[in-house]
Amino acid sequence: MKKILLVCAALFAAGAAQAKVTLPKIFSDGMVMQQNSQANIWGHATANKVVKINVSWNKTTYTVKSDQQGKWSFSLDTPAAGGPHTITMNDGERTVLKNILMGEVWICSGQSNMEMPMKGFKNQPIENAVQDILHATDPQLRLFTIKRNSTFTPVDTVTGKWQEANPASVREFSATAYYFGKELRQNLGVPVGLIVTAWGGSACEAWMRADWLKAFPDAKIPASPADIKSKNRTPTALYNGMLHPIVGYTMRGVIWYQGEDNVTRYPTYANMMTAMVNGWRNVWKQGEFPFYYCQIAPYDYKLIKYTINSAFLREQQMLAEKKISNCGMAVLMDAGLEYGIHPRKKNIAGLRLALLALNKTYGIKGITSESARYKDVTFKGDTAVVSFERADMWIYGENGYKSDLFEVAGDDHVFHPAKAWIERSKVYVKSEEVPHPVAVRYAFKDWAQGDLFSDGLPISSFRTDNWTE
């Protein structure tokens, strides 16, 4: 009996020593690889064994040697958009990846307004979803959703699978990401791969490493797994479980829709978001890749017991746009929902993110991608004159040459509704209640349906003062 056990143990050990090449789930059949790049691929094999990698697009065989733990990594020169292709890996036993496309790859991250699927949430639909899901079939649009995972230490793989876009897969996929990818497909004419790593209600801090959070002492880093009281809000927990495993997956850029959870902690958001983006760029080692994000949409946050005006968080997102290189912000002042934190118009969110990518990353001319932005204010007697930048097509109101969302205040810091009229790229603001204005605010509230535009895009809420309230 003992001899039989020893023989079985020896056979098991021999089998373990000759492990087949295995890959993280992100590398699997149906994947999209970034075209015209040196695309990273990594996995496990037999320890200290040469792994041969054959690629179908150039009939070349590459070799890489695994380390003592069996880990290996390699960068493949990828061709222009097209496919399908195959990759075969062999360390004595073959592993084959099939139906691979070359195209444009984007990471899509954030909280619930990124996670929200095309089918919507219960009682919370996506506008036009029924017909858009019906017409969603596109074999060259590939989707990968990373399953929620909150961990104390970084993990090496994720749960998910690559799927072609069709009504069944798109119904369960991020609406914001889908509409973004759909626009890229239609305008670039190449395969597109979308990787969604998002968790509703998640904090910005959760998507960051501990060393990036040193400048933010209020972010309490967990010292043990027991310290993860909130899976989606604990600092570092989602970076460890949902981002770290795909760091290095060669891609074009990132889209981000987050901020609602940070409203009550708004003063640090611009700096924190900047630190997060810089951190992601440092670990990805792809230089200053594009980072485009949605400004949170207006919503009455008092419904969820927030006492902080969310316009302060929108202001922080405006500041972040100036701090972060190679970025852009999609303004959603006209696409909110007063009594719902999950706006229905995800087609608008996806379109405006796509405008940024198509214009700023892919160089498509003739489209406006960035909203006009508050520049400065001057006071002439009882009238404030507000100027804007990025307003080549001047300013207009939803109902003509006026806006109903301006307020002015004097030295008493009390704001009063004001008359606002538009002349070219300036807005003139005046209130009979404030003979000597010193500050102006536009739509600076939790909920406001933005009514100020330039060249088809809404202008963010803003203020000219720096008062605490």
Regions found by a protein language model. Name each.
Residues 1-22:
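Bacterial Sec-dependent N-terminal signal peptides
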Residues 20-469:
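Cell-envelope and extracellular/periplasmic
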